A protein has these predicted regions:
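Alpha-helical scaffold segments
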Residues: 1-133
Length: 133
C-alpha cells in the first residue's frame, strides 16, 4: 500500500491521476484537482469534500461554475460569486447565506443593490449603508 506522501508526490507530478482521483484521502484528491486534466476535473467537481471542489473551481471552467453555483456548501457558492459571472451573480444574489450575498455585492452591480435594498438581513443592510446606496 502506498503511503500518503508518495501519492501526493505522484499527483503533484500529474502522474496516475485517474487512479488517484478516486483515492480515499481528500488531500490526494485536492492535489489531483490542481492538474488541468478535464477528464479528472469532470469527476472531482462532484467530490464529497468541499476543499476538493474548491480546487476544481480554481480552474474557472464554465462547466464547473454551472454546477457549483448551486453547491450545498456556502463557501463554494461564495467562491463562485467571487469569480463574478453575471449569470451566477443573478442566482447568488438570492442566496439565503449572507456570506454569499456579501460576495455578490463586491461586484457593485446596480440591479443587485436595488434587489437587496428590501432585504431584512441586518448585515446586508449594513453593507449597503457602507456602499452609500
Amino acid at each position: 500500500m502506498e503511503n500518503l506522501g508518495r501519492k501526493l508526490v505522484l499527483a503533484k507530478q500529474g502522474k496516475d491521476l485517474t487512479r488517484l482521483m478516486k483515492d480515499e484521502a481528500w488531500q490526494v484528491r485536492c492535489e489531483v484537482a490542481k492538474n488541468e486534466n478535464n477528464e479528472v476535473l469532470d469527476v472531482l467537481v462532484k467530490d464529497e469534500n468541499w476543499m476538493v471542489r474548491s480546487e476544481v473551481l480554481k480552474h474557472r471552467r464554465d462547466s464547473d461554475l454551472d454546477i457549483l453555483v448551486n453547491d450545498k456548501d456556502h463557501w463554494i457558492r461564495s467562491e463562485v460569486a467571487e469569480i463574478g459571472r453575471d449569470k451566477d451573480l443573478d442566482v447568488l444574489v438570492k442566496d439565503k447565506e449572507f456570506t454569499v450575498v456579501l460576495e455578490v455585492l463586491k461586484h457593485n452591480r446596480k440591479k443587485d443593490i436595488d434587489f437587496l435594498k428590501n432585504s431584512d438581513d441586518f448585515i446586508i443592510q449594513s453593507k449597503l449603508r457602507k456602499l452609500n446606496v
